[in-house]
Amino acid sequence: MEKKDCARRVFADDRFVSLTGIEIVSVGNNEACCTLTLDDRHRNARGAAMGGVLFTLADFCAAVAANSDRLDKTEAEGTPSLHWVSLDSNIHFLAPATDGVLTARCTPLKQGRTTALYQTIIESPGNGKQVAIVETTMIHV
């Protein structure tokens, strides 16, 4: 089974992610790509994606990336064993996201034994713009 399929199974019970419509596209070693198709439930009063929507997309993508090394073991054991969780995040909003599909790509900047720093870049492929950059410190629990 591919890592993305394992990740989808492991994170299937993440109810808020399910409500928002975030999809796992690909998973590599400590990397992940997730997408979100914007619709009216994601919009703020100005018609752009609410900042919390972008944050949720980035936070989830970081969780998938940080736990990617456990996905095969999780699948074999049959129960989730997610050991990396968000400790701190910093989001930089760069441009409004108004339409289409948002793509989040998360990669590690520094990987330690107990903490790790990940960067997630959210892009709007429709207009080719980066809409947010998020740095997330993960902690091993």
Predicted feature residues:
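Terminal targeting signals and extreme-terminal segments of soluble enzymes
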Residues: 1-141
